């Protein structure tokens, strides 16, 4: 069993989480994404839609968007792609995370505290919920194990076009009730910047 085997909402029962749904980022200010980057991402969206698989969406849309955010932040966080996170195999809290965001801007080493996970899905953003939540719980345990416990862990499930966000605080899981899509890139950028810069 691994992250990918978890389903939602069963993951809440499996991991002993209390679930709630409410707006999380309504007051977060958007960050302007320049026209060149938007054009580049639109091209990536078109290409990935034609190829129609998770790898294409991850490489052509999500990774470039996160890399742009990394630059806009002044390289203030660590960004890892396709990294294994093996915390507790007996509970299925192991596997490969599409993208991990870390507090420290390291490139060659995954170090606590991790702050967020972004999971890529091909067609339906909801299909990534179970995997995303399990990865968030693994991050919480990883940070605790390495002496860097964090109060809040964030997660996102995305097709590169649609985005849904989660927040985990101990055993309390909250799904953001607001939906975001490709037309809200500035808002999505603002949310992600809020996540990586808030301590």
Question: Would you name each region that the model predicts?
Answer:
Residues 1-67:
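Charged, often low-complexity linker/regulatory segments
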Residues 38-44, 111-119:
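Glycine-rich, often proline-containing surface loops adjacent to acidic residues and nearby aromatics
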Residues 61, 97-105, 113-122, 135:
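Conserved catalytic cores of phosphodiester-cleaving nucleases, focusing on short active-site segments
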Residues 69-79:
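Short secondary-structure junctions
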Residues 77-107:
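Active-site metal-binding core of divalent-cation-utilizing nuclease and nuclease-like domains
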Residues 81, 114-119, 153-159:
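Extended hydrophobic secondary-structure segments that form protein cores and membrane-embedded regions
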Residues 123-174:
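Nucleic-acid nuclease catalytic cores
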Residues 157-199:
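Short terminal or interdomain "cap/linker" segment that borders an active site or interface and mediates
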């Amino acid at each position: 069993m691994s992250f990918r085997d978890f389903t939602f909402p069963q993951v809440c029962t499996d991991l002993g989480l209390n679930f709630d749904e409410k707006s999380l980022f309504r007051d977060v200010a958007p960050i302007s994404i320049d026209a060149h980057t938007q054009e580049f991402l639109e091209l990536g969206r078109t290409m990935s839609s034609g190829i129609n698989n998770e790898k294409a969406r991850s490489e052509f849309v999500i990774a470039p968007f996160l890399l742009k955010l990394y630059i806009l932040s002044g390289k203030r966080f660590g960004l890892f792609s396709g990294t294994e996170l093996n915390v507790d195999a007996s509970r299925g809290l192991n596997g490969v995370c599409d993208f991990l965001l870390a507090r420290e801007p390291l490139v060659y080493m995954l170090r606590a505290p991790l702050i967020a996970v972004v999971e890529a899905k091909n067609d339906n953003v909801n299909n990534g919920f179970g995997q995303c939540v399990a990865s968030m719980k693994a991050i919480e345990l990883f940070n605790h194990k390495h002496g860097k416990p964090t109060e809040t862990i964030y997660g996102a499930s995305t097709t590169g076009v649609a985005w849904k966000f989660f927040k985990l605080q101990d055993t309390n899981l909250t799904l953001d009730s607001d939906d975001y899509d490709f037309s809200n890139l500035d808002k999505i950028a603002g949310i992600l910047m809020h996540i990586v810069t808030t301590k």
